[in-house]
Amino acid sequence: MGCKIKLKNAFKGYTFDQDKIVSPEETVGHFKNRLKTVNLDILEETVRIDNGRLDIPVYFSVCGRDALEIIGTKKQMGKGGTPSQSEASAVMELAERFSFFSFWKNPANFRLDTYKNVKGEALSFEAIAKSVHDESGELDKAREIFENLPLKWTSGCNLTKDREILIPFDWFFAINEFNGPSAGNCVEEAMSQGICELVERHTSSIISREKINVPAIDLDTVTDALTRELIGKYKNAGIQLFASDFSLNTGIPSVGALAYDPTTF
């Protein structure tokens, strides 16, 4: 069966530091308008909470009663180069968390079964074994046990092969909890962000696990205007800022940043 997700062109309508189909102001407006159409208390308010030292905007999106019950936490943080970007980030964090935990808590989204019964439709055992770095040489024994474990399976899309497959949701949730939920102005935006979140976690975990020396990035070579402005705000506050290239061999840019205040050391 082909994927239910069908990717389409999503033309950029906003390109100030971010590539989005609409501006952050439109994102926030659309989000709040959508909330008016559902009989749920999801968003209580958005609040700017940065203390002004860096002058880099940070927002909270504070959960309403129903969102708090579903998510279990009171607020989400959003950040951006401008106040509107930061507020949009905060409300989209709320959107993705509310959607994710709503999905997780709905039994209708899952099929409780064993790998033995679903393997013709499911992610391969070999791929599942790689998720826990099993190099024991005893995969045959592990397979015998795994095949009989009752797991919660849910439908996913193999974009490479354009087909639906079953994913052992609780297996991956036990390992990584919610790794890569993402929201966007359209499916393509959300998917791009989710894939990039997985890449950054993947590369940073490899670098940390294997203690890989990676190239430093000379911040004086940065040419993007807003990025230079943000770097300048750290310098003006007396905070040391370092960046490293975490891309490894993925072909997808990933950057690690470290900031520290010398007055606290």
Residue ranges and their predicted role:
Residues M1-F265:
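Helix-coil modules at protein/domain termini and other flexible surface or pore-lining loops
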